[in-house]
Amino acid sequence: MFALAVCAEMVFRALPFEERVRRIAGLGFMVEIWDWTAKDIEALVRTGATFSSMTGYITGGLADEAGAQDLVRTAEQAVAVASRLGCPRLNLHGTGLDSRGLPVTPVHHVTGAMWLTAYRTLDRLADLGERAGVTFCLENLNTAVDHPGVPTAGRAGRCRKDEKMY
């Protein structure tokens, strides 16, 4: 059996957010949310909805040291919120995104050092997730259409194309 989720950010937009969540849950779907810092978490808990995923950080990025420190620090905050919501998955985007979904600090060329930093950051997040009983998911955002400058997107796609399938 499988379950489907609907992103509360994208549907019933004329309604207050908590009502969107109630409607989605009432239709039998799990709920995805994005910027939890702008939400009344206790009101979301009271909806009784099942949350499938949420954004797993507030600021920061995977590929530079300063951004990585910030990403891990805010991921710890996200884990605490996920626990309150019973949300098992937290999304990452490789970099902080603004309100339009664009990178706060666009990166158009990723160096080897940046990949190593991203690897170390993901390793730290994996440890955090394991301790907290949640899974961090790296979302491969579309750079060609609506998320240019996300540092991990292009390479992740090329890795997939280059894999040998047996």
What are these regions (language model features)?
Residues 1-88, 112-113, 119, 163:
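N-terminal pre-domain/capping segments
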Residues 65-166:
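Active-site acidic/histidine proton-transfer and metal-coordination neighborhood
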